[in-house]
Amino acid sequence: TGEDLQCAKDVWESALKNAVGQANQLDALGVAKEVTNRITEPYQLIKAVWSATDWENWFNLRLEKDADPNICMLAFKMYEAMSKSVPLLLKKGEYHLPYAGKYDIPVTYSDLGGYEYETGYNVFYYDKERDHTIEHCLTLEEAIKYSVASCASVSYRATDMTLDKAEKIWNMLVKSEVVHASPLTHIATPIVNHW
């Protein structure tokens, strides 16, 4: 209730200030930031990218009455958003690319210099945070690199990803001696007629 709630908030704020002080002391001693940051994690809001093909069990676990209240609140917000969402069903050869969108542009035979009738679709990818015009389209390879780099840097980046930055991040992730492949797990394409 009111007084107890305020008391709980005060205790939480005191714990936060104490954690920050302890983290600052460890930092002054030269302890790695990855270690010192662990102390302040319970008090931080983070950004993350989650990709999945089936959410039913996750929602069953996290919307359950005994679930951690914070994750339950997040799960409820996610469930609400996903219930309102209209998924984009991908076809063979198309890709799930966070931070990159796509255009399906009808291609007609006249585009190729002949008679006008529809022959299919060309898919052009673009950076969702910038200009969506056809002049600024990405190739599939560029879109994959852009998406992977954006996923890799989601926790700290501003909205200033460029293809040059994406290429550098891509090279650090996949062309280094030790491969850091987890950001690539968000890139997906349908497996058709596999089962």
Tell me what each language-model feature is.
Residues 1-195:
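A conserved ligand/cofactor-binding region detector
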